[in-house]
Regions:
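Non-transmembrane "mature" sequence context
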Residues: 40, 57, 66, 135-140
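Generic structural signal for hydrophobic core residues of well-folded globular domains
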Residues: 28-33, 60, 146
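Short acidic, hydrophobic short linear motifs in intrinsically disordered regions
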Residues: 34-46
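Helix-turn-helix DNA-binding helix
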Residues: 53-54
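Short, cationic-aromatic polyanion-contact patches
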Residues: 15-22, 38, 68-100
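Short alpha-helical segments that sit at the start of domains
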Residues: 2-32
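A short, conserved structural fragment
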Residues: 48, 59-72
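Long, low-complexity, charge-rich intrinsically disordered regions
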Residues: 1-6, 96-155
Length: 155
């Protein structure tokens, strides 16, 4: 195996590749603002273990999405990633019509700008959801739970 092949194989095994839950963790930190948080509390609020949150922050730091302290998001890098990279790294997966939590243009603030028919709703499948619509797989399984507990994160 050549040098490039070894580098690619090494990168594939690296523990530093972003995972979907890493984006959830960074977004939760962003909406926390100046509020102090602990790994345990953050994990409980978004449905992850303390260990998962810790590993997510290490990967986010390695990717440049949080600062060296792993306490503050790098807003510029995060915005660039969300706008230009997320759809390629974690493409949306559509599913059947179901009951769930509104997402995309079906949720504020986009629902105020994008006019759509009541039957043209996108939802994350969620048993406690109150909207019926086309299902969209959430970035991570605990996203609907986390969004239902934190309206700011849901936006």
């Amino acid at each position: 195996m050549g040098l490039v092949g070894r580098a690619i194989a090494e990168r594939a095994r690296s523990p530093f590749g972003l995972k979907p839950q890493d984006v959830l963790v960074v977004l939760k930190i962003l909406v926390c603002g100046d509020r102090e948080w602990r790994l345990l509390d953050l994990g409980q609020e978004i449905g992850l273990s303390q260990t998962e949150v810790s590993f997510a922050l290490v990967r986010a730091r390695h990717s440049g999405l949080v600062d060296d302290s792993k306490r503050r998001p790098n807003r510029t890098a995060l915005e660039e990633f969300l706008i230009h990279g997320l759809k390629y790294v974690f493409p949306a997966e559509m599913g059947a019509v179901c009951r769930g939590l509104p997402t995309s243009h079906s949720m504020t603030p986009l629902s105020k700008t994008i006019v759509s028919e009541p039957h043209d709703q996108y939802v994350w499948p969620y048993a406690d959801g109150n909207v019926r619509g086309q299902s969209v797989a959430p970035l991570y399984p605990s996203v609907p739970y986390a969004a239902s507990r934190d309206p700011k994160l849901h936006e």
